[in-house]
Amino acid sequence: NTYVATVNSDGKIYAKSLGSTTISYRTYNNKTASFKLTVSGSAVKCLDISTWQGYVDFNKVKSAGYNYVILRAGFGREYSQKDNTFERNYANAKAAGIKVGVYWFSYSTSPSDAYREANACLYCLNGKRLDMPVYYDLEYQPAMSMSNSNYTQMALNFCSTIKKAGYK
């Protein structure tokens, strides 16, 4: 339903009005998948920030109308794989009055690895207070060839571990 949302050629989704729609897409290995998108409120401006953006002036980000950021806490299953700008970005975003969530980039290829990734994420968070959820970024190409049930179990394992630690 293009009245609710549209998808551009890069795969970015743009909410247009309140309502629900189903978005279908083809995965890298030519499988078809879909999800239901519900637009239930006004849109907010939010940035995804990691080491790839270099130094970020969060006061300028705030002045540009962004009230939310999702910071990459890290990637993979080792405690040493914390994003090297995470601590600075977290402190500077909070100091600028920007609400913070985090994501963990997954390199997992099995449901059991997802537990290790969640624990590495929790280690990097070290009890930090978040304003938004912890997101599990599942776009690692080798994992996408897993069965749907294993892929789903991987997400459930990560999310349940994060939730048990008190995060959303």
Task: State each model region's role.
Residues N1-G41:
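Extracytoplasmic soluble-region selector
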Residues V44-C159, K163-A165:
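Substrate-binding cleft of extracellular glycoside hydrolase catalytic domains
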